[in-house]
A protein has these predicted regions:
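Alpha-helical "hinge/linker" immediately C-terminal to small N-terminal DNA-binding modules
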Residues: 1-17, 23
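Central regulatory/effector-binding core of bacterial HTH transcription factors
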Residues: 23-84, 158
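Short loop->beta-strand "edge-of-pocket" segments that line small-molecule binding or catalytic clefts
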Residues: 29, 100, 116-137, 225
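Flexible hinge/capping segments at coil-to-helix
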Residues: 19-20, 90-100, 104-126, 211-215
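Beta-alpha-beta core module
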Residues: 86-93, 98, 159-209
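Hydrophobic hinge/microswitch elements
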Residues: 61-74, 80, 131-189
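Secondary-structure junction motif
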Residues: 37, 80, 124-148, 211-216, ...
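A late-sequence structural motif
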Residues: 38, 172, 190-233, 237
Length: 239
């Protein structure tokens, strides 16, 4: 009788959790140049599971992304594996790896190359997006010092990442970012950079008292992005 009562309580609590999740509101942070196509499918599947839930998608801060989680500004975020030291108050779940690519104008003399080494960028300009160090160091890319050592001009600065993309499209600068090998970026080409290993992309939420809807969103993301983890051609060049 005691076991049956305990089972009933657990069933009632689970039913209540599902009802609460369906009426919930979650905020998801998203990074620049992310895989928007797969992400939209994740949101669509989540909304199908919880049709009355509200999902807000906001840009993540490259300077202090972990603080957005801790302060409650976002419920779920995406991170590069090098952005944290396994902070115990946050639960990180690895999703897939992203290889580094050089973004450039299609008319650049390097645009026809199948892959590049950092030394190949000698004499080229690489634009910073205001928080340049933060954006690149977060994903283990080349530092300003490493770029300067091979003769890259790092003097061009844009106040926003969008402004940096415009400069790339104009052909006045390049940029180095992690992105999927099959990603299409309008108005520019991307060439794999061979000098750096892929960086791991993780999804994260606060570890304490995880809500059912947050857990469900993360499980959907793990399943959707699982195909990348088993297909290295999406994140690294095949030469």
């Amino acid at each position: 009788m005691v076991q049956m009562t305990s089972f009933c309580r657990q069933a009632l609590k689970k039913a209540q959790d599902i009802q609460d999740a369906d009426r919930s509101h979650i905020v998801v942070g998203l990074r620049q140049l992310f895989d928007y196509s797969t992400f939209s499918n994740i949101v669509a599947e989540f909304q199908h599971e919880y049709p009355n839930a509200c999902v807000d998608v906001v840009p993540q801060d490259n300077r202090r992304p972990l603080e957005q989680l801790r302060s409650g500004q976002i419920d779920i975020g995406f991170f590069y594996g090098s952005e944290h030291n396994k902070d115990r108050d946050i639960a990180f779940t690895p999703l897939f790896a992203l290889g580094y690519h050089v973004l450039m104008n299609p008319n650049s003399p390097l645009a026809e190359r199948r892959a590049l080494h950092l030394a190949d960028l000698k004499g080229q300009s690489v634009v910073s997006s205001g928080s340049f160090d933060s954006f690149l160091s977060a994903c283990q890319g080349p530092s300003l010092e490493q770029l300067a050592q091979v003769g890259v001009d790092c003097s061009k600065v844009s106040p926003s990442f969008e402004g940096a993309l415009i400069m790339i499209q104009m052909g006045t600068a390049m940029s180095i970012v992690p992105c999927l090998a099959n990603a299409v970026i309008p108005g520019m080409v991307k060439i794999p950079l061979l000098d750096y290993p892929p960086v791991m992309v993780e999804i994260a939420a606060m570890r304490h008292a995880p809500r059912l809807e947050v857990q469900s969103f993360i499980e959907i993301a793990k399943r959707r992005y699982g195909r990348y983890a088993h297909n290295s051609s999406l994140s690294s060049p095949q030469l």
